[in-house]
């Protein structure tokens, strides 16, 4: 399953109103570290399909959402459970570190 692409129009429905775990990758096209993390995020999306919804939010396209969650550096990963923030990770992290967010 590919990651869900988030924007101002679908963030509430896809993340805040979602039941279960949702991992949001806050990134930007110009961000080198974001590009380094992207394959790992895609791998997580495939491996945890049906268990964790994985979404990507381009901060340049939805700056207000990023700011409302205190995203000052990217990449930032935020794990939501039933619409509430559970954990936050800033910077490039390993697959194991991402998996540890919900284990």
Predicted features by range, described:
Residues 2, 7, 27, 53-55:
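Conserved Rossmann-like nucleotide-binding pocket used by diverse enzymes
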Residues 3-22:
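A short beta-strand-turn-helix
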Residues 19-21, 38-57:
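Conserved helix-turn-beta segment immediately C-terminal to the redox Cys motif
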Residues 22, 63, 69-78, 93-96:
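Structural micro-motif
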Residues 26-40:
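Conserved redox-active cysteine motifs that mediate thiol-disulfide chemistry
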Residues 78-103:
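Non-catalytic, surface beta->alpha helical segment in thiol-disulfide oxidoreductase systems
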